[in-house]
Structure formats: C-alpha cells, structure tokens
Amino acid sequence: MAPGGPFMRIIIGGGGRVGSGLAKALRSEDKEVVLVDNNARVVKNAQGMDILVIYGDVTKRNKFIEAGIDSAEVYVASTDSDELNLLSCALAKHVHAEKTDGKGNLTTICRLRNPHFVEEHKSGKLGQWAGVDHVVHPIDDAIDRLMSGLRSSSLSEVIPFEADAYIVELDVRSEASNVVHRTLRESGAKVEGGLPLIVGLKRDGNQGKVPTADDILLPNDRVAVATAGEASFNRILRILGHEAVDFPEKPKVIIFGASLIGTRLAKAWQRTGASVTVVERDLQLANNMAGSDIGDLPGIEIIHGDHLDKELLSEIEISSMDIAISALDNDHGSIAAVLLAMDMGVERTGLILYDADLVSVVRRMGITFSVDRRRVAIDAMLSRIHSELPGPYAVLSSVPDVVGICLPVTDRVKFVGKTIADAGLPEWCKVAFIQRKNIHDEWETLRPSSSKNLLEGDKLTIFLPPYRVYDLERKFKV
C-alpha cells in the first residue's frame, strides 16, 4: 500500500510557491500536512490552507520535534537553497530516528538545482551522507513538456505520461460544430474515428470533474484529453475547433542562453534531428558550451553575442528559424528575448519560467507555449510521495480538481483477465491509458476500450478527484 493512507503526516520544509503548492495538493487528498518556514509573510499566507503551519528554521532540531517528526512518514525539503534542503533532510532523518528509537521509517524528498548533487544522488552517495531518498530536479521533465507543447499554439498544457502517452489541455471553441452543445456520447457518433478521450472537464463557475458520457460540451469549456503520440495532437485540435499547423520534421531552433537549461535544451533538440543555434552574451558561458561535448555535436552552432542585438539576429537569419526558446535565468529577460524573436519573424516561441503567475500572462502576449518549472517540481514531488506507484502523478492545470495516477495490475487484484467494463472500477474515475509490454519487452500505450481485457503486468493511468486517490490505491492493493 502507498505509505500511510489518507492520514499520513507529511512535513514540508519551505513554504514558497513549490512548498505551498505541494501542501495544497496534498490537502486535497486529505493528507495531514505540516509546513515549516522562517518567513513571516509565507507563514501568514499559508494559515488559510487547513494545515499546521510552524514559524521556524528547518535546520533547528526543536522545529522538527514541534512538527511531529516522530509520527511523520515523509519529509519534503522544498526551499530555494540546495544546501538548506540537504542539511534539513539529514537533520530530519536524525531526529526521526532518535525519536522512534530507530524503528520508524522516514522518506526524504529533496528539491535540488545543482547538477553536481543530482549526480551524487544517481551514484547512491547522496543518501549516505545527506539522508536523501529521492531527488527532485525537474529540468528534463520541463523540457519534455516544452518540446511537446511547441507543436501547437492552441495547447495550454502538455503532460507526458511515458511510452508516448500524453495529456493535452485546451479550450473548446465554438467552431467545433460536431461537439459543442452535444453530450460526449452524441459527439462520439458525429466525429469520424470517434471523439478523443476526455478525462477532465472544467467550466467557468463550476468545479472541475471527470466527465461522463452524458456531460455536454460548451464553447470555452477547458478539457484534458488523453492521447498517444504527438502526431495525434492536430486531430484533437481540429475536432475541438482549433486550427492545426503541421510541425516541421527537422525544425531550426534558436536558444537564447547557454545556462544549464539552455544546454539541456540544445541537447534535447539536437537528438530530434533539429538544427540548433545558441546565442549567449556571456563569453565564458559561450566558451564553456563550445568546449564541452555539445560543441562537437553535429547541427549545433554556438554564438557569442547579445540576444537583443537586432543586427546580430538579422545576420544569423532569425526569420528563417522555426522556433525560438529563451533559457535565461531571469523571466523578464527571457520574455523580452522571445518577443523580439516574434517581431523578427519566428512563429513558435517557448519559455521555461520560474514565476507561475507569468504563464497565463505570456500566453496572452502571443508566446506559443511556456512551462512553469515549479509546477513540474510539484508533480515530481507528488510522484515521489506516492512512490509505490509505477508511474507519474499529475495535477491538471486547467482542471485542478482532477489528478492522474498510474497504477499496476497485479495478481492481487480481482479483475485480472476481465474487461475494463467488467473490472468494477468506480464511476468517479476514468482510465486514460493502458500500458503493456510488447514482445520486445518495451512499454506500449493502448487506448482503453470497454471490451479490452486487463492483463497482469499492465499499468493503468487513471484520472479521478484527488480525495479519491487513496480509495483507488486500496482497490489496486498498492
């Protein structure tokens, strides 16, 4: 079983955007949450969340005792400081062991930015000297979301779910004549090839929900759609009333900034066959990238220069680029860089942002797609907290009252060999994907149908209200 059930105690060190967002998500699952922070404003803001809030320093032993570390099952270090997070994880482990006479078990989850510490974790050494069980370093996940989201200007969110499975979030437009003012069942009969699988529905003024076949779609509804393969995005867009534009097979990509994120972005795009140009105004950073293994990769050009220099951008023919992405350390600087690229003719633009509030703002500016790295971090933390589960955990941004979890079909459940229709799954949840290993021992994503049999070893991605997560975990005996 996932640790502790609905009333497990989780202590969060750091109540900034990540810590408070995590606390809110966990309370929606009825978890017992304690938040510790030494910022009076943060503590005051958190007091309306129905959690225990403690003003204090997470490097102080007495604050962990006050937070009830002896009865806690998870400690999450979510401050903006790597060093503080590492130190607090080590202290939390020590105090917990001391208070339980070494008989308890505390899982520690540490948010980190420095890739050196991430490598320490991969080698297994970080757990030995810092007491860290899981590390959250969501840059690669953020890059995956950004690369998928840039395929269309109409998608508000893209969440990868392993084995080429995706959740895409978008609005329903009035032009979607086959689906608006119809039930999902009626729309399925009207749409050639069937209606895409909608797993979340949000209407202004109403709570988000997992829709049933009798729910009606209206213009401006926000929906979350389960699909397999990025090639399916355009079909979803057309059915829901959006214009679909083909994505270039080998795009030309310009990246502003040779930071850690810029470096990872360049590698990721190069692996897809794209040609990549990186512009970096800091000579040392530009030289560092050029002298690294990235500088030797085919299809990557690194230029030392100012990303706001119109003359330079004209010289490198920025108008011929398919995509412009800014990877600067400052959100406002990144926004300025891609807006200039838009003015100079680049149609698709992307950002990885620190400030969640800017995500909707930049969309109104016409920027194609942006990713809130803090939200990606929260999803990663939730996955680690539900560490008994075999796959990702995601909160839908457009439909915040619905979450997606991945659950295993084992020999312990009663519905092995049965169809989805006969499995007796509750009506408040919906299966988005079946993932199954093929003859090559590789995971494949299958579209669920009521007649498809569930086999031992399958993984089901299921969407449901967050307060029902524990109920479903019990049904799957995890």
Label for each model-derived stretch:
Residues 1-478:
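Cytosolic regulatory regions of ion transport systems
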